């Protein structure tokens, strides 16, 4: 087996593990935020145990990447007419805590493990597909793909900044969802 085939298998294996862990954790009776804390807490630990680290590169910020990460998700949702009508299912503090754990873990798993093996575009496609499968909302896919591609551009320059932006955008989405009464996740 070639190194490339092994790398692809490793990346796809992690994508399957992430999807399966979240799917299992969301089984009743847990709420969404508790499921995220459980699944992503375990996945983050596994990623660290596997050696995942955010590379210490510091070549500054990628303005195009940050813009795409920031506007990609809402623009993609708008283009495909995705409108979350449900109220956020849990309280603000619990959702903020859960989505910050999710952001850090997604950077350690998708960003530090899957993306180096599969590349940014394939990882963005799998990242978006995972969300569509788990959430059952296909109209989020384009926005999530664009969001990940923006983070990938930043990650190439400074992975820690990508993680901080990911966490900040998740946090802003939680607050916006609670203020508007429309869940963004």
Give the ranges of each region predicted by the language model.
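Alpha-helical transmembrane segments in multi-pass membrane proteins
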Residues: 2-51, 60-64
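Residue-level signature of transmembrane alpha-helical entry/exit and packing/kink sites
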Residues: 3-11, 36-37, 58-66, 91-95, ...
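Actinobacteria-biased recognition of intrinsically disordered, low-complexity terminal regions
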Residues: 1-5, 182-185
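Transmembrane helix-loop-helix hairpins at the membrane interface
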Residues: 77-82, 88-185
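Alpha-helical transmembrane segments of multipass membrane proteins
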Residues: 13-22, 43, 68-73, 77, ...
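Structural signal for the C-terminal ends of transmembrane alpha-helices
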Residues: 22-25, 46-55, 75-78, 152-155
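Short, aromatic- and cysteine-enriched interfacial helices/patches
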Residues: 63, 67-71, 184
């Amino acid at each position: 087996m070639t190194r490339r085939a092994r790398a692809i298998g490793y990346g796809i294996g992690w994508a399957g593990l992430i999807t399966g862990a979240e799917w299992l954790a969301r089984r009743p009776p847990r709420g969404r935020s508790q499921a995220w804390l459980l699944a992503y807490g375990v996945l983050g630990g596994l990623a660290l145990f596997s050696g995942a680290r955010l590379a210490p590169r510091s070549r500054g910020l990628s303005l195009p990447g940050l813009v795409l990460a920031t506007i990609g998700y809402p623009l993609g949702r708008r283009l495909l007419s995705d409108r979350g009508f449900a109220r956020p299912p849990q309280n603000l503090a619990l959702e903020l805590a859960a989505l910050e754990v999710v952001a850090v873990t997604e950077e350690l798993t998708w960003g530090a493990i899957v993306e180096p093996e599969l590349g940014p575009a394939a990882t963005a496609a799998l990242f978006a597909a995972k969300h569509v499968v788990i959430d059952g909302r296909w109209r989020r896919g384009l926005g999530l793909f664009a969001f990940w591609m923006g983070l990938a551009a930043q990650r190439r320059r400074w992975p820690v900044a990508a993680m901080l932006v990911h966490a900040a955008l998740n946090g802003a989405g939680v607050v916006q969802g609670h203020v508007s009464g429309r869940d963004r996740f």
